[in-house]
């Protein structure tokens, strides 16, 4: 069997563009958030998406206990916020850098997000170092900004909606 080494895998994955998201939670275990691009649709019946979270991440226990989350998809210009939530900055400083409102699950929704998906974690599957969080979507909030933000080739890229 041919096993692909970690660096080859990571280099190949850098060729797959993905939306940039800040995943947030709030509940009995506290408030937390992190930046993620490992997010995708699972099905529209019932509306479900998935988020991949490293079990070694400092935020993992908070998400594991709260069982709710909000996927906040960023728009162009929000790169500094992505970097803030992707680093070791204390949680209170991360959340102080933007305006938030509580979603139906109580999770923080970024007011200027391109779109926010307010979810309850319905199932968790462990694979390697990560948990795959299957998330039942309870509410969606869209913002009118025309610019998306993707992570591709290890850097940010702005996308604009077509005029037609």
Curated annotation (Swiss-Prot):
It comes from the Bacteria. The keyword Cytoplasm does not apply. One of its GO terms (molecular function) is FMN reductase [NAD(P)H] activity. The keyword Oxidoreductase applies. Gene3D superfamilies: Electron Transport, Fmn-binding Protein, Chain A. Belongs to the non-flavoprotein flavin reductase family. RutF subfamily. This is FMN reductase (NADH) RutF. It comes from Escherichia coli O157:H7.
